[in-house]
A protein has these predicted regions:
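Auxiliary tRNA-acceptor-end handling modules of aminoacyl-tRNA synthetases
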Residues: 1-180
């Protein structure tokens, strides 16, 4: 639980793409700052930190900004085990869901003609954890409109390889740039 409320940079990149989609392996798909938080009902929440408005914690306006900038909940996990102040959650199904946080956004899906995700045709390739980061590789398949690319035209499906890199950010962030 030492990582609760710690900011984590989640970067998603393509590891493989079908031909003629205009997307290539290694390209950035998505990037967000996320954090884990315990909910009052005992669930573990994964939230996206929206860095839209900000004030110094000692400023009077800070409370107004805080209550007017609710960070969205990306996922809620049941805590499976709690021992020695460490929470254990199952994340496998989360990585196989179709969510914007860990995959293509709506515009990218439209460009590639992606429709419904096919969980039966998707899998987790690997999960590797290191002291400061975790790498998750998935292969996901979507139903696709046939006019967008060769894979969709031939099969009605598009398969993409994705890598999600979670990097723990420093607990004391760098100071903001005051001007350029």
């Amino acid at each position: 639980d030492s990582l609760l409320n710690r900011e984590i940079l989640a970067t998603v990149r393509f590891t493989s793409t079908p031909a003629n989609t205009g997307k290539y392996g290694g390209e950035l798909v998505n990037e967000q700052t996320v954090y884990f938080q315990k909910a009052p009902d005992g669930k573990m929440l994964l939230r996206s930190r929206l860095l839209i408005n900000k004030a110094d914690s000692v400023d009077n306006i800070n409370r107004a900004i805080t209550i007017s900038n609710e960070d969205p909940i990306i996922a809620a996990f049941k805590i499976e085990n709690l021992a020695n102040k460490a929470s254990k959650i199952k994340v496998g199904s989360f990585f196989l869901e179709d969510n914007v946080a860990l995959g293509p956004d709506r515009m990218q899906k439209t460009q590639m003609g992606l429709q419904a995700l096919l969980p039966a045709n998707s899998y987790i390739e690997s999960i590797k954890t290191f002291p400061m980061n975790t790498e998750v590789r998935t292969v996901k398949t979507w139903m696709a409109s046939s006019s967008t690319n060769a894979a969709a035209a031939l099969t009605g499906k598009v398969t993409l390889g994705l890598n999600v890199s979670f990097v723990l950010l420093p607990s004391s962030p760098m100071s903001s740039r005051l001007f350029d």
